Amino acid sequence: MRLRNKPWAADLIAENPDMILVSPENIASNWQSRFAKEQPIYIEVGSGKGQFITQMAQKYPDRNFIAVEIQESAIAVILQKQVELKLPNLQLLLGNGAALTTFFAENEVAGVYLNFSDPWPKTRHEKRRLTYKSFLAEYQQIMQPTGYLRFKTDNQGLFEYSLASLNAYGMVFDDISLDLHNSDLAEDNIQTEYEEKFSKRGQVIYRLEAHYK
């Protein structure tokens, strides 16, 4: 979902280079230098307004997190939160999730989160889905051998597509939930803004976790 333009976004981003990078060219393999401690790095591709990634950073201080978002207006909202929170284990990246291998080195990432990604329902837009094979190849290249991919959505069609796509790519499923909020995983689940809103309306949330062979 595209947010309304925020006239103040560009200035806020320019004022906080220690918290956010804009399509950097020389950051691959150097992300640890941007954090207070050298810890495993986890990224969320398509972070929206940032509720998930900021709460994850607060809950897991022994991990480093990077919010990857292509919309300036969206990442500016996350940056507002980070300016206030000043979490030492959170960095922001304004950039295209289709270019992750430009921003991250091989084996630099311990895990990838995809939360409520745009389903791009039309067949001609299949290549834009974040679980399309070209994206899976991007994640694989930057992920450590022990890393994982976690994906949540309320869109049944996208979930079924993603199961088929990951399976065709040769990934191994560690967990599949057809009703996350009524499963054993619900207690530790950190919700996105979107997830919170629609789960209250009774919308079923789907989740999977998988790794590369």
Swiss-Prot record:
Q: Which InterPro entries match?
A: SAM-dependent_MTases_sf, tRNA_(Gua-N-7)_MeTrfase_Trmb, tRNA_methyltr_TrmB_bact
Provide a Gene Ontology MF annotation, just one: tRNA (guanine(46)-N7)-methyltransferase activity
By its UniProt entry, which CDD domains does this protein fall under?
AdoMet_MTases (cd02440)
- Look up the EC number in the record and give it: 2.1.1.33
> What pathway is it annotated to?
tRNA modification; N(7)-methylguanine-tRNA biosynthesis
Q: Please name the gene that encodes this protein.
A: trmB
Cellular component terms (Gene Ontology): tRNA methyltransferase complex
**What keywords are annotated for this sequence in UniProt?**
Methyltransferase, S-adenosyl-L-methionine, Transferase, tRNA processing
What family is reported?
Belongs to the class I-like SAM-binding methyltransferase superfamily. TrmB family.
What organism is the protein native to? Latilactobacillus sakei subsp. sakei (strain 23K)
- Active-site residue list: D118
Q: Where does S-adenosyl-L-methionine bind?
A: E44, E69, N96, D118
Q: Where is this region: Interaction with RNA?
A: 124-129
* Chain residues that bind substrate: K122, D154, T192, E193, Y194, E195
- Tell me the function of this protein: Catalyzes the formation of N(7)-methylguanine at position 46 (m7G46) in tRNA.
Q: Which SUPFAM superfamilies match?
A: S-adenosyl-L-methionine-dependent methyltransferases
Enzyme class of the recorded protein, top EC level: transferase
Q: What is this protein called?
A: tRNA (guanine-N(7)-)-methyltransferase
Catalyzes what?
guanosine(46) in tRNA + S-adenosyl-L-methionine = N(7)-methylguanosine(46) in tRNA + S-adenosyl-L-homocysteine
